[in-house]
Amino acid sequence: MNNMFGNMRAYGSLKLSLFIVCILCLKPFGSRAQANEGSPWYVSCELSSKYVWRGLEYGKSPTLFPSINYESGSFLAALSGAYAVDGSHQEVDLGLSYTIKDMVTLGLNDYFFPSAVGQNDSYFRLRHSDTGHNVEASATFAPTKLPMWLKLSCYVYGADKDSTGKQAYSTYAELGYQYVFKNEDKLSLALGANLNKGFYTDYERGANVVNIMLKYESWFTFNKFRLPVSASYVLNPYRNKSYFTFSVYFSTK
């Protein structure tokens, strides 16, 4: 019985991956009217001095984040990756999100971390017992009329296992505030915490603050061209760590 349910969950994870790929492949063959309005496709890339996510450090060097995106109305699908320039971290992600009434965004993401030697990886190993994937469901409340957001996310399937080998359901909550200046620069402050014994605290501690972030977003201006940049100070009280990162952004959108 357990094997049957495990196979069903693995099949569900595979369907998510194939569904995202199919969307990205088939959508261009839509109506001519939509094509005349401009392509819903765009490519984006971020170059960051260090990969820090939710108070956790990934890799030891500057990291490149390329992404292929499809956006139509409130729907967004993305194929993205993360590659540290010294090879200390690799990541391949699939994501879907849908925003309801410019207020609530529901998301489903698949995170996969290839090893340093790619030939040893098995992307389609989807069994619950030994898969390298992590599937996360999330909900973000961010009304356009309020300069704040509240995010709740949970790892619902995959390699997120506790010390007993059971699914840990690592859960993260984040409350943030953003101030927009008259010149469109943005200053954000976020407070994030894990809500259970998950990977944010190495499956050893329950609720803890793991991410305090102060971020400033602006542009470098070259004649009429503006290059988006950001600087972030990140503090992880649980791990007694702090980081400062700088990022530049490129997009065809």
Regions found by a protein language model. Give the residues of each.
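Cleavable N-terminal export/targeting peptides
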Residues: 1-40, 253
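Short glycine/proline- and aromatic-enriched beta-strand/turn motifs that initiate or cap beta-hairpins
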Residues: 34-85
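Residues that define the transmembrane beta-barrel architecture of outer-membrane proteins
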Residues: 39, 60-64, 71, 88-92, ...
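Repeated loop/turn-to-beta-strand initiation elements of outer-membrane beta-barrel proteins
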Residues: 41, 74-79, 102-108, 143-152, ...
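Detector for outer-membrane/organellar transmembrane beta-barrel domains
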Residues: 74, 125-198
